[in-house]
């Protein structure tokens, strides 16, 4: 099952939700502002990142700039607590399943969440 972590006002989040719905991909939606991610959720996501916290923290966010925190000097537990308290620190949307992780919306990369049969059929239809 796909988990879509988003905030409703985020344009990229709305695009990701619309894309998943239009391709009839089942997913569970999590509003990170009303239901902040647990530290276990965050740890699970971090295990799938290539660059660790750098991939999930939005350094351009107003919250990040206002807090003026040097995330490189925080322990992982301190960082997880901070993100739990301030979910707007996260880049959004976060889309994950048992194998894949996508942070942000990219129409080409999100195709990884389509079932293989769907992608194969779609590819064959473009050849005909």
UniProtKB/Swiss-Prot annotation:
Keywords associated with the record: Cytoplasm, Disulfide bond, Redox-active center, Transcription, Transcription regulation
Cited function: Global transcriptional regulator that plays a key role in stress response and exerts either positive or negative regulation of genes. Acts by interacting with the C-terminal domain of the alpha subunit of the RNA polymerase (RNAP). This interaction can enhance binding of RNAP to the promoter region of target genes and stimulate their transcription, or block interaction of RNAP with activator.
Gene3D superfamilies xref list: Glutaredoxin
SUBUNIT field: Interacts with the C-terminal domain of the alpha subunit of the RNAP.
Gene that specifies this protein: spx1
Protein family (similarity comment): Belongs to the ArsC family. Spx subfamily.
SUPFAM superfamilies per UniProt: Thioredoxin-like
HAMAP family linked: Spx
Subcellular localization, as worded in the UniProt entry: Cytoplasm
Protein name, entry field: Global transcriptional regulator Spx 1
Spans traversing the lipid bilayer: none
Primary subcellular site in the record, as a coarse category: cytoplasm
Native organism taxonomy: Bacteria, Bacillati, Bacillota, Bacilli, Lactobacillales
Example of a GO cellular component annotation carried by this entry: cytoplasm
């Amino acid at each position: 099952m796909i988990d879509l972590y988003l905030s409703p006002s985020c344009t990229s989040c709305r695009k990701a939700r619309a894309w998943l719905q239009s391709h009839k991909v089942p997913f569970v939606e999590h509003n990170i502002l009303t239901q902040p991610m647990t530290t276990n959720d965050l740890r699970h996501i971090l295990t799938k990142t290539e660059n660790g916290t750098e991939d999930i923290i939005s350094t351009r966010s107003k919250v990040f700039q206002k807090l003026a925190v040097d995330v490189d000097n925080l322990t992982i537990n301190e960082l997880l607590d901070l993100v739990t308290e301030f979910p707007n620190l996260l880049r959004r949307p976060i889309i994950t399943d048992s194998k894949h992780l996508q942070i942000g919306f990219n129409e080409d990369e999100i195709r990884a969440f389509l079932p293989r049969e769907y992608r194969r059929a779609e590819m064959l239809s473009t050849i005909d």
